[in-house]
Amino acid sequence: MTRMVNCVKLGREAEGLAFQPVPGDLGKKIFENVSKEAWAGWQRHQTMLINENRLNLADPQARSYLMEQMERYFFGGGNVDAAAGYVPPTR
């Protein structure tokens, strides 16, 4: 049976994550309140931030920045950084 959550990002009930995606209290909060669909959206945004800002994930400051952005993406009203000069692909 699929685990359902009231997703804070989508504002509706949706399929929940299968496991806690990050350790700690933030990971628990995400597991309990974020859907698979919203998590996939974060992964796309995170990839854009890493690539456009040329973040080195071996750098503790870069990892801390991404954790802060993740919390803001889900629980900060969507108030997250956008990569400077990023232009979404045209279809």
Curated annotation (Swiss-Prot):
Record bears the keyword Iron: yes
GO (cellular component) term, any one: cytosol
Pfam families associated with the record: Iron_traffic
Record has Iron as a keyword: yes
GO-annotated molecular function: iron ion binding
Domain of life: Bacteria
Keywords, ordered alphabetically: Iron
Cited InterPro entries: Fe_traffick_prot_YggX, Fe_traffick_prot_YggX_sf
GO-annotated biological processes: cellular response to oxidative stress
Role description: Could be a mediator in iron transactions between iron acquisition and iron-requiring processes, such as synthesis and/or repair of Fe-S clusters in biosynthetic enzymes.
Family: Belongs to the Fe(2+)-trafficking protein family.
HAMAP family cross-referenced by the UniProt entry: Fe_traffic_YggX (MF_00686)
Protein name (record): Probable Fe(2+)-trafficking protein
Organism: Thiobacillus denitrificans (strain ATCC 25259 / T1)
